[in-house]
């Protein structure tokens, strides 16, 4: 079988906040639901959150239409305050991993967040990539590439606003 070659999606963003606060916004349950949704009209609720290396978090997002989407996040690496690596899956309310709701969407996508700080500004590099995609999954990934920044980009806008609010700016 031939290995499928593809490029990950990389989003870079600077936040006017210390690196420790940005890291905590990614790793503390009380921060996550304040920003980790595609837009401000979507609500979030955690059922469980063991945000540690090897741990899992389980939450739902509720869309303005009332539709709910459950997500299970498995944490692979947490290096305070520099690196966060996780894989997120669609799941049932009970935490069972479900097939993606989008046709041919990769079953497993890993996110790697790298943080660095200079002069009170935290730079984030967010890398998003499928793990062992089938040919159809790789094609769906590439076809959707222009949209990759929209969902996470909306979340990162909310994160910037939330960090400013927390800092009292």
Q: Model-predicted segments: where are they?
A:
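Hydrophobic ligand-binding cavity/cleft-lining segments
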Residues: 1-44
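Short, highly charged C-terminal tails/helix-capping segments
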Residues: 161-169
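Hydrophobic pocket/interface hotspot
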Residues: 22-23, 32, 57, 75, ...
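Beta-strand/loop substructures that line and gate deep hydrophobic ligand-binding cavities in soluble
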Residues: 96-150
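Hydrophobic-ligand binding "helix-grip"
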Residues: 47-48, 64-119, 161
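A solvent-exposed, acidic/Ser-Thr-rich amphipathic alpha-helical stretch
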Residues: 38-59, 66
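Intrinsic-disorder/low-complexity, polar/charged segments enriched in Ser/Thr/Lys/Arg/Asp/Glu/Gln
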Residues: 6-12, 19, 44, 56, ...
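Generic short beta-strand segments
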Residues: 56-62, 87-94, 127-131
